[in-house]
A protein has these predicted regions:
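N-terminal secretory signal peptides and thylakoid transit peptides that target proteins
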Residues: 1-20
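Glycine-rich dinucleotide-binding loop and its adjacent helix/turn
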Residues: 134-209
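A Rossmann-like FAD-binding core segment of flavoenzymes
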Residues: 97, 101-109, 114-117, 125, ...
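Conserved small/polar residues in nucleotide/adenosyl-binding loops
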Residues: 324-331
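AMP-binding/adenylate-forming core of the ANL superfamily
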Residues: 130, 275-276, 314
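Glycine-rich beta-alpha-beta "Rossmann" dinucleotide-binding loop(s) and their flanking helix/strand
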Residues: 136-160, 267-303
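Beta1-alpha1 glycine-rich phosphate/pyrophosphate-binding loop at the start
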Residues: 27-101, 186-227
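Short FAD-binding loop at a beta-strand-to-alpha-helix junction that anchors the flavin cofactor
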Residues: 307-323
Length: 331
């Protein structure tokens, strides 16, 4: 969950080149960096390690999907400001323009001692340095009554793709004057302002086509990122439409029922016509399998993004954790 800048990857490429120069000479082959995860972090890392090393490093990107849909800008799609296709990207340019080796398979596990990534096909790829950018996994069990099955009725849409399309269809299809319930996640999680940006886009849709609709936010927190700005904006642009209820006020979500679309709290039982539940989160599973996590997240050395648990592994993006990342949820 640490912001990434190009200079970080330039430094990583330079550091990796230096660190691997001796082994590569000994074995008569280029040093190899394997990147797991083809999202924004992983794809950017693969690009600039390949580009800035000027061919001195063999770069392989392991990503199961052949097309990546961004979570950022998904709210613009939700609000009808962008077409769905515009947030999708392929990996053609990485391979053709920068010589990155693309492996479209699942990375199942990492053998740290042997420095190998084990793939879903049963094969493995060796590495000298490993970059993991696994994104997040959702802790469905963190909300009583929510589950992987319930996401088809109450989409989290916290991983882009079909979930975001489902959420948009439900928002647009909600009955006139109905109630939309949003349950944001507890800290820490991917993109602290994200749930409230999403509420804003949903309110934008309702203002156009369903102006008597209501939005209820049942928050597991007592404050949220950029709260003052959001509250001011909601009052200005969507007066009377959005109600934010803190954990202190509703007393906690005791249970949800995806069949009846009900949310039971100490304050009341809320009935939704459409809903989005975003559960608690943790680093993507491959980071756990690589043993670079401490609990739900992966501690890193902020200056280099090197995993604290393994000097040969770097962890990027939402899966990584540092003091700076924790502070981001408070501002």
């Amino acid at each position: 969950m640490t912001k990434m800048k190009r200079r970080t990857f330039v430094g990583l490429a330079a550091a990796t080149t230096t660190a691997l120069s001796m082994p590569s000479i000994a074995f008569g082959a280029l040093p190899r960096v394997v990147v797991i995860g083809g999202g924004a972090g992983g794809a950017t890392a693969a690009k600039y390690i390949a580009k800035d090393s000027k061919g001195a490093i063999d770069v392989t990107l392991v990503e199961a999907s052949k097309r990546y849909y961004t979570c950022f800008f998904s709210n613009l799609y939700l609000g009808d400001f962008r077409a769905y296709g515009s947030i999708g990207h392929n990996y053609y340019g990485l391979a053709v323009n920068h010589g990155v080796n693309m492996v479209h398979e699942w990375a199942l596990s990492v053998n740290n001692a042997a420095k190998k990534v084990n793939l879903g096909s049963g094969e493995s790829i060796s590495y000298d340095k490993l970059v993991i950018s696994p994104g997040i996994d959702l802790k469905f069990e963190s909300v009583n009554g929510y589950s992987a099955e319930a996401q088809s009725k109450m989409p989290h849409a916290w991983k882009s793709g079909t979930q975001v399309q489902l959420l948009k269809n439900q928002v647009k299809g909600m009955k006139k004057g109905g109630t939309f319930v949003m349950v944001p996640p507890p800290n820490p999680y991917r993109c602290p302002p994200g749930p409230y940006e999403r509420v804003s886009m949903i309110a934008h849709q309702f203002k156009k086509s369903n102006p008597t609709a209501k939005i209820v936010i049942l928050d597991p927190k007592n404050k949220f990122s950029k709260q003052g700005l959001f509250m001011e904006g909601w009052q200005k642009h969507y007066p009377g439409m959005i109600e934010w209820i803190s954990a202190e006020t509703h007393g906690g979500i005791k249970k949800i029922n995806a069949t009846t679309m009900e949310f039971e709290t100490d304050l009341d039982t809320f009935k939704a016509d459409a809903a989005s539940v975003v559960p608690a989160q943790r680093a993507g599973r491959i980071a756990m399998n690589a043993g670079v996590n401490n609990g739900d997240w992966c501690p890193i050395v902020p200056a280099s993004m090197q995993a604290q648990a393994d000097e040969n592994i770097y962890v990027l993006g939402d899966a990584s954790v540092s003091y700076t990342h924790l502070r981001a949820h408070e501002t």
